[in-house]
């Protein structure tokens, strides 16, 4: 049968490209590694600002990768629908700053706030970056049933310290010993999409 297409994007030497290749090899996918230059990144900024209708530095920076990877997919494959990891940080306590939550109640309320506000910024940005290249994005981490279930889990089970328990600890634990991801990727420290 036909292999699943997977995609990664980054500048040459990016550690995220290396880890994405490890996962692709492990899963046996048809992997596309998209290496971009600083010039490619800078050249895309004006188009990205137009597409997402925002000048916000953080938003634009986070959108360039989505735009460039979806542009590559549109120009080089017959893929029309793509899956991404949007929402996993918000739903699954993936932001490093959450380890400093002063209480379990604060961790829970911040996670709920992030999910509630997600559609104002990240999802809209991502959708516009991807759809501007004629693709549709699917976001499994934002499935309503998954979000409702995950938010109902006690904060005690989701808390992390950044050392013994990394961000998205419970999600990582769910994949542990399942043979679905290599341990070196499953248990690696987080790197922001726009930084990797």
Which residues fall in each region the model found?
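PAPS-dependent sulfotransferase catalytic core
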Residues: 183-196
